Every structure is written in C-alpha cells, then in structure tokens.
Amino acid sequence: MKKITHINKENKPSMVDISNKEITKRVAHAQSFVNFPEEITKRFVDGDIKTAKGSVFAAAIIAGVMAAKKTHELIPFCHPIGMDDCQVNIELDKSGKAKIDCICKVTHRTGIEMEAMVGASVAALTVYDMIKAISHDIVIEKTRLVSKIGGKEDFNRDKS
C-alpha cells in the first residue's frame, strides 16, 4: 500500500522534505471542462464570448497562469518552485463545452502537477465568474491530471 506523504511519523500534517531528491525535468498536464447552457452557447462568436470585462477565454487563460504560479500560496504543503513554463489553452467544441488544458514545466526536485491542476481549475472558475450574470446553470467538471513526466514515476491517464 502506498504511503500518504504529507503525514509524518507522529501522524501530523507535514511538508515533504525534498532536499535529497534529484533535480529532474517535470511536466504535468491537467484538464477541466466547462458545460454551458444553450442561452450561453448562443452568445459565442469565433469561439469566445466578449463581455464588458473583455474576452472571457483570454481572461481565463491569464488567470490560469497566474494561479498556477501561486499554487504554493493556496495549497498548504506545496513547495514554492520557479516554474519554467505554463500554457493554458481553451477549446470550445460543437456542443458548447469548453475544454481547458494547463501544461506546466519545471526543472526541480518536486513535481508540478498541483500547479497544472490549480491553473486548469482557476481558468474554469474565471470562465464561470465572467458569464454567471447570463446564467448560473454552468457546470465545471472533470478537473483531473491527464499526465505527468518526471519524478518517481510517469503517469498518463490515456495509458492507465
């Protein structure tokens, strides 16, 4: 059985000591999906909605990157790491569902999957925030890690 890493020998919450871990390249890809009701999908023009606050998806991309960079301030035991890259992409399918991908990269002693998860999550929340005045019937779902490379083991949801 795998050990929970953020619990110490005294059974108390604890940050993981990464000081002896090897520095390697780490990449993580997370996704989140946003489902829109028809009253919102009717308002999409060229794959985006423009509001008084600006482009919904442009704001969400910026928010996702900003959030990924601040993950250590939001998740108690995440280490502050100097991220090498963070890319957020939002695609709208024909049914009116937005797929948000956040891919983060770092060369460090610890993984970057929480940063990718936070980036995808906050991008989705930003989409909701910017269009909730039109409808509250927006559903954010399936926020998940798609893949990670580096560290003890790689992970790929499509191959597991």
Question: Where in this protein do the model-derived segments appear?
Answer:
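C-terminal binding/interaction regions
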Residues: 1-79, 85-160
